[in-house]
């Protein structure tokens, strides 16, 4: 019998294969649709401070979303790795300050103002897949799980 970790790993492989099979055009349309729907939710409209991941590789291109958050006058914070397995929200006012950090993921400089978790109204996190009940399947590193668990 497979362990839960083995089942999750197998599911991640299947989902990754699907993502890799997408054409560039399909990916662009999918990215736009996700961003369109996110920015039309009541949660987004009400949010004053938004924590959002910076997509890379197989993940959606979140740069248009990050630009929209700033254009809408919202306070933006993105992941900032502050230690092994520890991630906080670093405030960003200008996307040009983002530089490759841990694992090559663009993040703000270490001296960026840290946003208190209590101030974050909406979190937009990567998701490899989700259950019908809304349980998120991440990429396996646990950074976002640990971050979200502290809310």
Describe the predicted segments one by one.
Residues 2-119:
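N-terminal active-site beta-alpha-beta segment that forms phosphate/nucleotide-binding
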Residues 108-112, 126, 150:
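Mid-sequence acidic-hydrophobic segments that form the walls
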Residues 133-151:
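Membrane-associated lipid acylation/remodeling enzymes share a hydrophobic transmembrane-juxtamembrane segment
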Residues 82, 101, 126, 135-139:
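Generic detector of intrinsically disordered, low-complexity, polar/charged segments
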């Amino acid at each position: 019998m497979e362990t839960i970790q083995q089942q999750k790993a197998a599911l991640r492989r299947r989902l990754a294969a699907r993502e890799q099979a997408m054409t560039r055009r399909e990916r662009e349309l999918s990215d736009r649709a996700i961003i369109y729907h996110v920015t039309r939710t009541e949660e987004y409209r009400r949010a004053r401070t938004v924590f959002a991941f910076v997509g890379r590789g197989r993940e959606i291109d979140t740069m248009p979303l990050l630009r929209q958050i700033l254009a809408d006058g919202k306070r933006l914070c993105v992941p900032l790795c502050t230690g092994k397995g520890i991630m906080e929200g670093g405030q960003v006012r200008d996307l040009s300050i983002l530089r490759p950090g841990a694992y090559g993921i663009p993040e703000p400089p270490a001296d960026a103002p840290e946003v208190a978790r209590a101030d974050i109204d909406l979190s937009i996190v990567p998701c490899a897949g989700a259950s019908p009940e809304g349980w998120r399947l991440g990429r396996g590193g646990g950074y976002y799980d640990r971050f979200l668990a502290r809310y």
